[in-house]
Regions:
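Nucleic-acid endo/exonuclease domains
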Residues: 1-101, 105-181
Length: 181
């Protein structure tokens, strides 16, 4: 296991090469994100994990075969990997990132182009969703700002009406009126 790399694996390099060929630009292994995603596309607010079928326990895959020796160790290891993958995915989604998982078996020559077409379609859809989410968030902020301004104006008008019975020097009143504008 000491020779197993966590970065720059063959499947990861294949996906990266194809993404670059299709015009996508990305960052690698961002440590500030949970799980240190293999590929991060900031513009699309999307992360891509390229998982090996054996190490991450891809169910129903021919490349995931449980070893016959030391069965309890391998079952625990694969179970822990699956659990960690689920937690990392949930955490990233909670932070607003879109998560794509590409399995090693999906990169076989017969399935490679269709897999990468699906990844590209997901990226483009994520970009659209991210921009629409961003725009709706901006509209929510603006609406909240308008409501806060209205409340502030109501409070100031109530204060003025409650203070109208008191004698307020003209200089103070003029300063108060100019600060509202």
């Amino acid at each position: 296991m000491s020779r197993i790399r966590s970065r720059n694996t063959g499947p990861e390099m294949t996906v990266r090469r194809e993404l670059y060929h299709r015009g996508f630009r990305y960052r690698l292994n961002r440590k500030d994100l949970p799980g240190t995603p293999d590929i991060v596309l900031n513009k699309y607010h999307t992360v891509i994990f390229v998982n090996g079928c054996f190490w991450h326990g891809h169910e129903g895959c021919t490349k995931y075969v449980r070893p016959s020796s030391n069965v309890s160790f391998w079952e625990a290891k694969v179970k822990a990997n699956r659990s960690r993958d689920a937690k990392v995915t949930a955490h990233l989604e909670a932070l607003g990132w879109y998560v794509i998982t590409v399995w090693e078996c999906e990169l076989s020559p017969s399935r490679f182009l269709s897999t990468m077409d699906e990844v590209e379609a997901s990226l483009r859809a994520n970009r659209f969703r991210f921009l629409s989410d961003k725009a709706s968030e901006k509209r929510r902020r603006e609406a909240g700002s308008i409501l806060r301004k209205r409340k502030r104006a109501d409070v100031l008008s109530k204060e003025k009406s409650s203070l109208s019975g008191h004698r307020i020097p003209k200089t103070v009143r003029s300063l108060s009126d100019s600060s509202e504008e």
